[in-house]
């Protein structure tokens, strides 16, 4: 899976799954621009990417920030070949207790930017008649989870968006897919106590949490020439927790 000469943009690349994706794309030969919400986070991305890319500060909820970031990338690197929409947050609460801000924050961060970022890179991809858009979803978007109606709705929306956009752009050589992780070893899961961890693993036939690099491998495959005939799909990477 050689990605030499490709320009990749990965949102939310400062740590966890996003960082693993950015690092593996670099290993496969791509030049990677990773984004973070702060200048400090962007600097950290630049440090780990080295001469193979750079970090930029991006607020995915702000239209002007998106436009400015994409202009910088186009001016310095050229048109984007691979977009990985990874940035996201959680605001968990039971529906009866959920505040409007908790709902809106999730939709505005986890769903709306998928539309804005994808639309922003699409013209360049269609002009080249080639492109890859990979959206990072979640197992919660298909199976649901108590306390996450906002998050589940957003991630289910990502899947619907992916399928619809894929139908619109397939004839132009652009593929659009979703990778849906299950429970992955991240800073958030490392904070679980033993009982919480055991309860989580009881639902995973593989008997372990996933590694961020396993998600990255799925993303990089979908970004590769070998995946040119795959579009509109959701690739579940969850250790058997949810089987379609």
UniProtKB/Swiss-Prot annotation:
Instruction: List the catalytic activities from the record.
Output: a (3R)-hydroxyacyl-[ACP] + NADP(+) = a 3-oxoacyl-[ACP] + NADPH + H(+)
UniProt keyword annotations, A-Z: Fatty acid biosynthesis, Fatty acid metabolism, Lipid biosynthesis, Lipid metabolism, NADP, Oxidoreductase
Spell out the PROSITE patterns in the cross-references: ADH_SHORT
User: Active site at which residues?
Assistant: 151
Please list the GO terms describing molecular function. 3-oxoacyl-[acyl-carrier-protein] reductase (NADPH) activity; NAD binding; NADP binding
Pfam family for this entry, one: adh_short_C2
Question: Which PANTHER family does the UniProt record give?
Answer: 3-OXOACYL-(ACYL-CARRIER-PROTEIN) REDUCTASE, 3-OXOACYL-[ACYL-CARRIER-PROTEIN] REDUCTASE FABG
How this chain assembles, per its entry, is: Homotetramer.
Q: What is this protein called?
A: 3-oxoacyl-[acyl-carrier-protein] reductase FabG
Organism encoding this protein:
Vibrio harveyi (Beneckea harveyi)
Q: What is the lineage of its organism?
A: Bacteria, Pseudomonadati, Pseudomonadota, Gammaproteobacteria, Vibrionales
